[in-house]
Structure formats: structure tokens, C-alpha cells
């Protein structure tokens, strides 16, 4: 099926945010998924800059798998990325990334990544990106918002690495402003904000990051009652990794993971996804092909 493509100028409708006020480049991408017969298709994409999706895949029939390509050079101060994804009624899209998103040292301006995901009634969306690496000296703002209509189903995660300890970068300087919102029928299910400086006691506190370099959150909605217990029983957590799961009264499952490195945290997230996919989405696990490369 042909996909409508359009270059996206900053003033075009619907742009996800106003033009940046600080120096730097801007990348923007709008994706629309819709059900076409028995399959979901990427029916429209509008883009500006290097944030792109190339081809899509259907390895499990109806769901559409898409790979988001981040700028290969990463982000520095003043750069902005805007991603807007709409999943139409009854459609099912799964998105991942082939590599990490990287935020580099800033001289003072924020590097900003805004992501908005809108799910129509009966839509299913899985957002399973690779890690976001915050290099020492970066000033990073990560904004994620999920808007769910009635009957929509969601599995999504975000994994953040503070520096690259294996390469000697322990994030000695830098700032993170991380924001997360999940709404269902415009009613809030979850609101979170993390403001973290490199020297924040939260990094080593037992009630915080416990000295770990990598942290992640996985969300799933609607989660059947008791799924958090099934998940805890099923996971084989790698050494050094801490994991907790909570189900909110509204049916939103929140899974938190802490670990010393990207690989063990990612393996934990992938295990969790394999465990909860069928109860939440109604399909057995079908990992994106890129995970095997």
C-alpha cells in the first residue's frame, strides 16, 4: 500500500510544538496508522529533518511493525525532536528503534525530545524503543504523553542510561527533566516528573536510583487483575537488577527496573513484554526482527 509522505515545515498543521526558541536543529515526524482490511498500515507520514521511519513489516499478520531512526549524530544543546503518532480505530502498531537515542554535552541549552501518542477506540500500540543515553554534561528534557480512547490497549517503555560507565562516563555533570503523562478519555491515569541533577542525592538514595546507572519504566493498559503478581513470578531478573510492579486501580500496570547497565535492564524489559503481551494485547510475543541483529 502506498504511504502518503509530506515534508513537514515548522508552520504546517498539525505540528506537535512551536518552533524552537534556542539555536539548534529540529527534527519532527508525524505518523498515522490505520486499519486497512485485515491489516494495519502506515497511511501517512510527515517529516522534517533526520527523524524518519523507513519500511514497515508485518511479521505476525495484522499488526504493523515500524522502526524509528533517530539522528545518527545524537542531540546537543538546542536540538529538538518532535514525534507524534496516531493509531486509528481498531489498528495495531508496534514501534521500536534500531539503536539508542543519544544526548551529548550542552553549553547551556536544553536538548528536547517530545513524544505524543494518540490511540483511537479499540486501537493497540506497543512502543518498545532502545535506550536513551545521557552523556555527561548533557541537559536533556524527555517528554512522553499517551492519550488513550475507550478500549485502547497500550504497552510502552522508556529506558534511560546516565552516562556510559563502561566507557568511563559516570554522568559527573548534567541535568535530566523527564515528564510522563498517561490519559484515558482525557482523564489522568498517571502523571510523573523527574528533575535530576548529576549531584542529586536521589542517585544514591535507597529510595531513589540506589547507585544504578540505568533505570526504566514499562507501562501496560488495561492490565488484568493480578498480572503484577504473575509478572513477578515469571521473570528471571539478571544479577544486580531490581524490579518492581504495581497495578493501579484503573488497570494501569507500572513496572520499574533499576540496573548497572543497559543490557541487563533491556533483557528484563523484554522478558516483561513477553510475559504480559498476550494478557494485555491478546497476541503471543512476536519480537521485532531488529532485536535479533
Swiss-Prot record:
Keywords assigned by UniProt, alphabetized: Chaperone, Cytoplasm, Nickel insertion
Low complexity bias (residue ranges): 7-22
Subcellular location: Cytoplasm
Domain of life: Bacteria
InterPro entries: UreD (IPR002669)
A GO CC term attached to the entry: cytoplasm
A GO term, aspect molecular function: nickel cation binding
Region of interest (Disordered), residue spans: 1-22
Function statement: Required for maturation of urease via the functional incorporation of the urease nickel metallocenter.
Subunit structure: UreD, UreF and UreG form a complex that acts as a GTP-hydrolysis-dependent molecular chaperone, activating the urease apoprotein by helping to assemble the nickel containing metallocenter of UreC. The UreE protein probably delivers the nickel.
Entry's family note: Belongs to the UreD family.
PANTHER family found in the cross-reference section: UREASE ACCESSORY PROTEIN D (PTHR33643:SF1)
Protein name (record): Urease accessory protein UreD
Annotated gene: ureD
Amino acid at each position: 500500500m502506498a504511504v502518503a509522505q509530506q515534508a513537514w515545515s515548522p508552520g504546517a498543521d498539525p505540528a506537535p510544538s512551536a518552533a524552537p526558541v534556542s539555536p539548534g536543529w529540529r527534527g519532527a515526524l508525524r505518523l498515522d496508522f490505520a486499519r486497512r482490511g485485515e491489516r494495519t498500515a502506515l497511511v501517512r507520514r510527515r517529516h522534517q529533518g533526520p527523524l524518519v521511519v523507513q519500511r514497515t513489516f508485518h511479521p505476525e499478520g495484522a499488526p504493523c511493525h515500524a522502526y524509528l531512526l533517530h539522528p545518527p549524530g545524537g542531540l546537543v544543546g538546542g536540538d529538538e525532536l518532535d514525534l507524534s503518532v496516531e493509531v486509528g480505530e481498531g489498528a495495531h502498531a508496534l514501534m521500536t528503534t534500531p539503536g539508542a537515542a543519544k544526548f551529548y554535552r550542552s553549553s547551556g541549552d536544553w536538548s528536547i525530545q517530545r513524544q505524543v501518542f494518540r490511540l483511537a477506540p479499540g486501537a493497540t500500540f506497543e512502543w518498545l524503543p532502545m535506550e536513551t543515553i545521557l552523556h555527561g554534561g548533557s541537559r536533556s528534557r524527555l517528554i512522553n504523553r499517551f492519550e488513550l480512547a475507550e478500549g485502547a490497549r497500550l504497552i510502552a517503555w522508556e529506558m534511560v542510561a546516565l552516562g556510559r560507565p563502561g566507557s568511563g562516563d559516570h554522568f559527573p555533570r548534567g541535568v535530566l527533566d523527564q515528564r510522563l503523562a498517561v490519559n484515558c478519555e482525557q482523564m489522568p491515569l498517571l502523571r510523573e516528573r523527574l528533575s535530576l541533577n548529576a549531584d542529586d542525592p536521589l542517585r544514591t538514595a535507597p529510595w531513589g536510583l540506589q547507585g544504578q546507572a540505568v533505570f526504566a519504566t514499562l507501562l501496560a493498559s488495561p492490565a488484568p487483575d493480578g498480572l503484577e503478581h504473575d509478572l513477578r513470578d515469571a521473570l528471571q531478573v539478571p544479577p544486580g537488577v531490581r524490579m518492581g510492579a504495581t497495578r493501579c486501580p484503573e488497570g494501569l500496570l507500572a513496572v520499574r527496573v533499576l540496573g548497572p547497565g543497559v543490557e541487563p535492564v533491556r533483557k528484563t524489559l523484554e522478558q516483561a513484554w513477553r510475559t504480559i503481551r498476550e494478557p494485555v494485547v491478546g497476541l503471543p510475543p512476536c519480537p521485532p526482527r531488529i532485536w535479533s541483529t
